[in-house]
Amino acid sequence: MNFQAGGGQSPQQQQQLAGGPPQQFALSNSAAIRAEIQRFESVHPNIYAIYDLIERIEDLALQNQIREHVISIEDSFVNSQEWTLSRSVPELKVGIVGNLSSGKSALVHRYLTGTYVQEESPEGGRFKKEIVVDGQSYLLLIRDEGGPPELQFAAWVDAVVFVFSLEDEISFQTVYNYFLRLCSFRNASEVPMVLVGTQDAISAANPRVIDDSRARKLSTDLKRCTYYETCATYGLNVERVFQDVAQKVVALRKKQQLAIGPCKSLPNSPSHSAVSAASIPAVHINQATNGGGSAFSDYSSSVPSTPSISQRELRIETIAASSTPTPIRKQSKRRSNIFTSRKGADLDREKKAAECKVDSIGSGRAIPIKQGILLKRSGKSLNKEWKKKYVTLCDNGLLTYHPSLHDYMQNIHGKEIDLLRTTVKVPGKRLPRATPATAPGTSPRANGLSVERSNTQLGGGTGAPHSASSASLHSERPLSSSAWAGPRPEGLHQRSCSVSSADQWSEATTSLPPGMQHPASGPAEVLSSSPKLDPPPSPHSNRKKHRRKKSTGTPRPDGPSSATEEAEESFEFVVVSLTGQTWHFEASTAEERELWVQSVQAQILASLQGCRSAKDKTRLGNQNAALAVQAVRTVRGNSFCIDCDAPNPDWASLNLGALMCIECSGIHRHLGAHLSRVRSLDLDDWPPELLAVMTAMGNALANSVWEGALGGYSKPGPDACREEKERWIRAKYEQKLFLAPLPSSDVPLGQQLLRAVVEDDLRLLVMLLAHGSKEEVNETYGDGDGRTALHLSSAMANVVFTQLLIWYGVDVRSRDARGLTPLAYARRAGSQECADILIQHGCPGEGCGLAPTPNREPANGTNPSAELHRSPSLL
């Protein structure tokens, strides 16, 4: 059955699509408030009931462990975002809907953790993540809905992502049904929407059944929303989906603020009147411990750089142009030609129409702040011919160009220029410095610098001399003149341009007439008024003019008397790097060139400011490191040396997790790194994984193990001689004379170690590692399993346990029965910190890539994390 979305709606459905939600579905604020109060007040009675049940547990150790977990849950509830998050932190609320076959859970999991999980979550989930839009951080609330959209869901969301599987017809039909249901509760024009088709389940046994035309037809029926095809297995377009939907929400909010009028008291994040019991997000295990790429840096690899103030002001006019256009608009853009001859009102009208079309282009990616068709002089051929290029300027400091609009949309054959290492020049004049406001006399920015950021990563062609990837560019600073100051000395004009042809020579050597102060006065006017300075005839110049006429496709009269030809051939600007590389571009009008030049200058300024802010972040990082070291000092027992009780110790033993005085640290160094890894608390660097170990342990915990059986011995004091301290330290750590005894058990030490990891018992783990041999600490979970304690700690994303196990000799290269290393478990658990530790110590990564294919999963569909949940019962 071929499903035709949008066809055959009932009158009621048509009314819902056109006029918004019926009145009877209006959500009562009073009822929502009462429901939220009831939900909130019901939490603590249930927690107190759990405490009463805990008291009935006879095993005191188990009782204390459960109590600690409940206390942690209670603290997390009491300190939820509604009570602690600053009012200045804006939120973006995104709902994900689709049936169980859509692949939406895998899409969300890939975005949050960078890994692929095949199972679909029937109950959905609630997740949080930081996302950056236009240089500002937002708290992204992701609500994976387990069923169709309900009234409370519709009132909560800022945007909706509809998900279906390209190999499942039912999931495709479900999308439109869910859309109609959403429209019955909420006006569709108020909610940005994105349609996603997932490729995860496509295989030889499950071929694709939804072709591209049907999917795009559905996206048109869904209020012309953007359509993406994603693959959670390899991460295709996953990041782009969430970045795009966030940009749509931000753009819609700014558009609504502009519609209200200028008001400085507007809140950063609009509040919704509906609050319900289901709006408290739950914590996901893979979300809590991810600290990598990146932490969350990898997930935010498309984070935009800090935009300049001038860009924000200039982009206000077309802030609504944030959604990716439909294929109809793309086709109409291809038929336009902005280089045709125009006169009078027709010129202005057609120019604005062409610019509107250009600014609305963007297939499946964020809209650049400026884009359009320019002529670019080739740097490869001998004749230096001019060719049309589709040029885009993004707020990440990159200027990109493609042979055609089609290549740009397909993201192929593109080259990029890093503006941080360049400057922009106009042959024949010295440019003013970029300023936030529009220069007087220039035309309005009809191109409307859009707020949206481009996440596109363009692959530069190899061997092109103008490709930014072909050389390391060191830029020249932008010109520092703040305004056009009239005629300048001739020498300054000579230095402000790149002389490479007869035409450029004429522009570079021409002096401006007195009184000409406006920067929009192009070199063409100077040339036409100064015939004495024309250069000698050059065959290269004639060929250049001929090629330009040919490339524009518009016949023009030849001869020096044609002012139109001279004007159209002189709107050139050059991007120059300090290494001597040049990129020559030409616009169709002087106004368009001014827009491009000022936009490029603004991006150069923003890139330079971004470098300065990076230094500020480094300084701030040093302050944070000092605070972290201070946190280590405040750990229980760390006020005194672990061996001699000297006050205020400032040296540390990493694998012991303890602090010591400088004299004892010298003795520890002689023990060897296999017994004590010494580091200065103030002079050395402290990466996060080492700080985690030090703050988790401390002198009190360490001495409860290493001095757990002192008997009649007494430890030396701060004033004891060095020989006495050394005898004590060697007896304590080398001979292990005072080591606390192991608890009586028939279970082998290696199996106890596995249990300690699963039960998250740090003191028992340290004791077992101190007693165990290398063979015992490397004992596996079972003969047919092959997992070591390091596999389990990596699967639990436990950074402290992972680091301690490696220090005490657990083999990082060990593999389980399926050939997976601990690194594979860490990556599947979404822990970048554990993965970094394992890689640093030589854990192999083959067979455990970031995007495992579905056939690497077990036959029963489980993964290591799921097996881990059964580990306590198996142990």
From Swiss-Prot:
Widely expressed. GO terms for cellular component: cell periphery; cytoplasm; glutamatergic synapse; nucleus; postsynaptic density. Residues 84-375 are annotated as: Small GTPase-like. Keywords: ANK repeat, Cytoplasm, GTP-binding, GTPase activation, Metal-binding, Nucleotide-binding, Phosphoprotein, Repeat, Zinc, Zinc-finger. Residues 87-261 form the GLD domain. GTPase activity is stimulated by oxidative stress. The keyword Repeat applies. Residues 10-23 have a biased composition (Low complexity). The modification Phosphothreonine is found at residues 324, 326. Residues 495-512 have a biased composition (Polar residues). InterPro entries: Ankyrin_rpt, Ankyrin_rpt-contain_sf, Arf-GAP_GTPase_ANK_PH, ARFGAP/RecO, ArfGAP_dom, ArfGAP_dom_sf, P-loop_NTPase, PH-like_dom_sf. The keyword Chaperone does not apply. Pfam families: Ank_2 (PF12796), ArfGap (PF01412), Ras (PF00071). A zinc finger (C4-type) spans 641-664. Belongs to the centaurin gamma-like family. GTPase-activating protein for the ADP ribosylation factor family (Potential). GTPase which may be involved in the degradation of expanded polyglutamine proteins through the ubiquitin-proteasome pathway. Interacts with PML. Interacts with expanded polyglutamine proteins. This is Arf-GAP with GTPase, ANK repeat and PH domain-containing protein 3. The gene is AGAP3.
